[in-house]
Amino acid sequence: MLDPRARTLLKTLIERYIADGQPVGSRTLSRYSGLELSPATIRNVMSDLEELGLVSSPHTSAGRVPTPRGYRLFVDTMLTVESPIDSDAVTRLVQTTLQAGEPQQKVVAAAASVLSNLSQFAGVVLTPRRSHVFKQIEFLRLSDKRILLIIVTPEGDVQNRMIATQRDYSPAQLTEASNYINAHFAGLSFDEVRRRLRGEIDELRGDMTALMHAAVTASTEEPADEETVLISGERNLLEVADLSSDMARLRKLFDVFDQKTSLLQLLDVSSHAQGVQIFIGGESTLVPIDEMSVVTAPYEVNGKIVGTLGVIGPTRMAYNRVIPIVDITARLLSLTLSQQ
């Protein structure tokens, strides 16, 4: 445990380093900490913090910078989340951008853009898993023996499938089949529909049964549980010296964006937690770059967590500003999707 004096100096050091991006010396700490301490006393405290692994000394400077462990202590125990921007203005902007009634994919993509614009870093969203369950289906006759199957999920996502049939169906027959399925099976997975059809096959005409089996087969041909990572504002990170000053680091950063595997893993872990999570590079093995941090929060549809969103930026980010941006966006995205 740190004593109050050491906590104050560590908090001041991290706040000044986030603001200025330069190693922090004893004179700066004396000026901003509010403590009446001699430079020698401050240097002694800094040496103690360095032994604890909370700060380090760059070879080219007499000042010190926070380590990942120091950042972790700061965000867990010292951070006061008071956004310098008007939270009401943020709320209005997010509400204006996230329009209820729009396709789910468009709303989720808009959330990534909002996060990027507000944070000036990269916004990232893990899209909801494709639903195994359907809310409504419709058959549309395209030509002889070719039918378009339209599937509407409970989240409002619309999926289309092509069905090749053994015979021609009239529009009236297609309406009859879709009405039967919607009346008896809406809210179930297509695997469950398949099982139910086996038990109810005697109640249906053979041609209707064949059409329904074709619909079930078509609906399950594509993976239902694929997740996608949407990223907006990657180019903002080119303006961040901490991430872009080294070409190898920059190449690794864009490899992360291109492959998305590590981001998918990190966001998936975040979806199992409540509230805002902070992953600090160099401390969390989930963050692939030491100088990068990710602030995430899960979002919901009708009370059920379906995905995660967040901001990717430098470890030296204004956490007190980014955290409320992520939190407000997650809450309003949840509200918008639940109104679909």
UniProtKB/Swiss-Prot annotation:
Pfam families: HrcA, HrcA_DNA-bdg. One of its GO terms (molecular function) is DNA binding. It comes from the Bacteria. GO terms for biological process: negative regulation of DNA-templated transcription. InterPro entries: GAF-like_dom_sf, HrcA, HrcA_C, WH-like_DNA-bd_sf, WH_DNA-bd_sf, WHTH_HrcA_DNA-bd, WHTH_transcript_rep_HrcA_IDD. SUPFAM superfamilies: GAF domain-like, Winged helix' DNA-binding domain. The keyword Transcription applies. Transmembrane segments: none annotated. Keywords: Repressor, Stress response, Transcription, Transcription regulation. Belongs to the HrcA family. Negative regulator of class I heat shock genes (grpE-dnaK-dnaJ and groELS operons). Prevents heat-shock induction of these operons. This is Heat-inducible transcription repressor HrcA. It comes from Burkholderia thailandensis (strain ATCC 700388 / DSM 13276 / CCUG 48851 / CIP 106301 / E264). The lineage of its organism: Bacteria, Pseudomonadati, Pseudomonadota, Betaproteobacteria, Burkholderiales. The gene is hrcA.
